[in-house]
From Swiss-Prot:
Keyword match Cell inner membrane: no
One GO biological process term: regulation of translation
InterPro entries given in the database record: Ribosom_uL1_bac-type, Ribosomal_uL1, Ribosomal_uL1-like, Ribosomal_uL1/biogenesis, Ribosomal_uL1_3-a/b-sand, Ribosomal_uL1_CS
The keyword Transit peptide appears for this protein: no
Organism: Anoxybacillus flavithermus (strain DSM 21510 / WK1)
UniProt record similarity statement: Belongs to the universal ribosomal protein uL1 family.
Disulfide-bonded cysteines: none
Function of the protein: Binds directly to 23S rRNA. The L1 stalk is quite mobile in the ribosome, and is involved in E site tRNA release.
Subunit structure comment from the entry: Part of the 50S ribosomal subunit.
Protein's name in the database: Large ribosomal subunit protein uL1
A GO molecular-function descriptor: rRNA binding
Record keywords, A-Z: Repressor, Ribonucleoprotein, Ribosomal protein, RNA-binding, rRNA-binding, Translation regulation, tRNA-binding
Length: 233
């Protein structure tokens, strides 16, 4: 257990660990208990009743948050010809093909997301061992392997976030910055929560959403009562 600083311990006193808070109150507490001296990221963590070892209980995808994450993401598009032109017009930060694959092989990583057209995936596969461990490998499930490169770039720039269940059955997703209005964070939270409910694997048994927590970077976690979240039917 890491040693906590004085500011963290003081902030943690404001939170009742035995209580699950209404989502708005939880987010207000996260803002109040932020101990970072910068505009910290607010993250939601879901503990799910799934067995990620089973192929039919894997959860992975992406969703556009209505208010973005507050982070500018640099997009590399691997495409040729007309698709490369479309990516440039859409505002991709870098556009190319094997030239950028060679750069990545040499240790270049000045980007946050890769979008690739399906015809480029044979080449991209050559650097799979480099991209995979960093979570940068393009994937059709997250909309990053597509011929509609303009749409992919626009969605990423608009605040698209990826989610993926880890080995312990948890999903962590950023929903904005502590400087965001509470309402915007609540709406971003509701969007990702609604998405997680929609992608419940048919094979999952028992309670699906076991626990939901929100926290800021370096701040204490606050338990959320999911029943207080307004979810569209």
């Amino acid at each position: 257990m890491p040693k906590r600083g004085k500011r963290y311990l003081e902030a943690a006193k404001l939170i009742d660990r035995s209580k699950a808070y209404a989502v708005q109150e939880a987010i207000e507490l996260v803002k109040k208990t932020n101990v970072a001296k910068f505009d910290a990221t607010v993250e939601v963590a879901f503990r799910l009743g799934v067995d990620p070892k089973k192929a039919d209980q894997q959860i992975r995808g992406a969703v556009v948050l209505p208010h973005g994450t507050g982070k500018v993401r640099r997009v590399l598009v691997l495409a040729k010809g007309e698709k490369a032109k479309e990516a440039e017009a859409a505002g991709a930060d870098y556009v190319g093909d094997t030239d950028y694959i060679n750069k990545i092989q040499q240790g270049w990583f000045e980007f946050d997301v890769i979008v690739a057209t399906p015809d480029m995936m044979g080449e991209v596969g050559k650097i799979g061992r480099i991209l995979g461990p960093k979570g940068l490998m393009p994937n059709p499930k997250t909309g990053t392997v597509t011929f509609d490169v303009a749409k992919a770039v626009n969605e990423i720039k608009a605040g698209k976030v990826e989610y993926r269940v880890d080995k312990a059955g948890n999903i962590h997703v950023p929903i904005g910055k502590v400087s965001f209005d509470t309402e915007k964070l609540v709406e971003n939270f509701a969007t990702i929560y609604e998405t997680i409910l929609k992608v419940k694997p048919a094979a999952a048994k028992g309670t699906y959403v076991k626990n939901v927590t929100v926290a800021s970077t370096m701040g204490p976690g606050v338990k959320v009562d999911p029943s207080t979240v307004a979810v569209a039917n």
